[in-house]
A protein has these predicted regions:
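Juxtamembrane extracytoplasmic/periplasmic/luminal helical "stalk" adjacent to the first N-terminal
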Residues: 4-11, 15-86, 104, 164, ...
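Solvent-exposed, extracytoplasmic
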Residues: 88-100, 195, 199-234
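Extracytoplasmic/periplasmic sensory segments of membrane signal-transduction proteins
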Residues: 59-163
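Extracytoplasmic/periplasmic ligand-binding sensor regions of membrane-associated signaling proteins
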Residues: 130-203, 207
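Short loop/turn microsegments at loop-to-beta-strand junctions
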Residues: 106, 181-182, 217-219
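Juxtamembrane transmembrane-helix termini
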Residues: 29-36, 132, 207-210
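Active-site-proximal beta-strand/loop segments in catalytic clefts of secreted hydrolases
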Residues: 111-113, 169-170, 225
């Protein structure tokens, strides 16, 4: 009887241990899966929120340029050629107010195609830490083939496409600074007359990305259309 009882107790204990082992394994697996799901949801939420924040920033820059562009197009409608210089001055006074209300602007400009005028060149303003926006000498566009989209991309690309365009990171000819820019072509009597644009310091974009925090060791990055890793320019 003792032998049978001992065997029965041993079998019961083994059954309990097996049941506990299975329950523990199920519990650990469930907790691990729950943690994985929570991590996935957190990653998705963080990336979505970060992307929306950056997208909103891009849209604010676009809106600033498009606002100036639309006002310029309206003022140029029916304008005599002799008033070109005066209208450019009006744009100058308008643009500076909008630029100060757009975060991260490094430069803004309105450049006239030299095929339209050899004397009215437009303007180019650069933000300086202590002095705000200051006018700088403009690039001599007449020294370039404006049909060659590999040069002066901020001018030649919107001229070629005929629409507003974001340009990938490039170095400005005069400042040697890495920037991205949004540029819109301007027309007068259905003829291309110049480009309005804003350049944003590339550092501003990288800071927006670096501000996206994912747990303790995670990080965010961007990929361009060629799958180049950002924030570094490669």
């Amino acid at each position: 009887m003792k032998s049978i009882r001992s065997k029965f107790m041993l079998l019961t204990v083994c059954t309990i241990l097996i049941a506990l082992g299975i329950a523990t394994w199920i519990g650990v697996t469930a907790i691990r899966e729950l943690g994985r799901n929570d991590a996935d949801e957190m990653l998705h939420l963080t990336s979505t929120t970060g992307a929306m924040h950056i997208e909103n920033y891009f849209e604010s820059v676009e809106q600033s340029v498009e606002t100036v562009s639309n006002l310029v197009q309206d003022s140029f409608d029916g304008m005599p050629y002799e008033e070109l210089e005066a209208q450019v001055e009006n744009v100058r006074n308008l643009f500076i107010r909008i630029a100060y209300h757009t975060n991260g602007v490094l430069t803004y400009y309105f450049r006239i195609d030299p095929e339209i005028s050899e004397t009215v060149k437009g303007f180019w303003y650069v933000y300086e830490e202590e002095n705000g926006f200051q006018e700088h000498e403009v690039t001599d566009i007449s020294q370039y083939d404006t049909n060659d989209t590999s040069k002066l991309v901020w001018f030649t690309v919107p001229k070629a496409t005929g629409e507003g365009v974001w340009l990938p990171p490039y170095n400005t000819e005069n400042l040697g600074a890495a920037v991205i820019s949004y540029n819109v072509p301007v027309y007068w009597e259905d003829r291309f007359i110049g480009v309005i644009g804003i350049e944003v310091a590339y550092e501003t974009l990288t800071q927006e990305v670096e501000n996206i925090e994912i747990f303790q060791t995670g990080y965010a990055f961007l990929l361009d259309e060629n799958l180049n890793l950002k924030p570094q320019i490669v």
